[in-house]
């Protein structure tokens, strides 16, 4: 039997927004900020929302106008509170106003006379890549590149099995040491999950850590093994919180009366064949994950190569385009794809075009 391994999953908290706050010498945990290109109208997507602004129920991938609308709603409630407490200011027009506004969560929490404001920071992708590289180099001070898998610009998996006896540390202590150094060097807070496999490390970070108190720096570290996973998460809902379980999969599971991972595990005991009928080879992954198993380790995910290649090109237009202009955009994107195929020495047998329509114009017919 193979020795049990220990994995870390580390996620940089609201990474793009945190970088923008730090570069402005502001606290990423208490500064209200969105990363969005306001020049592309309020329909542009927010690439990141700071934690304090998320606390007002603004999702991380909201459209800018949705953030504007939610802030307006919050300020309407705050103004009523300020009026009741005789802290609002009556202007020359006879209407009540806030005495001032603030984008700092601490100030807003202590003074109801302040209106909620926020910073709109234009995205700077090269800057985010530079900071991500700096943080990756911090991890390399503790582990070998062979034991790190960058999952995204702000998230990594690390196999720390062999390092725990070397450093005479627990997984929690090693995770905290690395996260603390990232915070010290960059000002960016991270969340970590510890698991006996990659899947459990990811869930510890994504789900369990969100429900434990943060330390004074906003750091959260959670741990899972197979037994604690079943105890803590078999009844957790919604299923979409679980890694690699999307809305389409969840809809098909619910059609079979499966609403939790515990339901799925129990169903698999006698209904395994039915799961394979519905999900094909993906049923194996679903069943493994329901029980807290994950057979792939660091070596397998680093050596994985897809059986097929795909490349894509996309644009978010700043306003509705008529047919002739849209045709020009599509032609330009097709030419870019052609050049990229040539560079990679690839050919294709399939081209897919997806077009999203402006909601207002669709409603108008």
What spans do the regions from the language model cover?
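DNA-contacting surface of Y-family translesion DNA polymerases
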Residues: 9, 241, 249-365
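Gly/Gly-Pro- and Ser/Thr-rich, intrinsically disordered tail segments characteristic of DNA damage-repair
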Residues: 1-288, 296-298
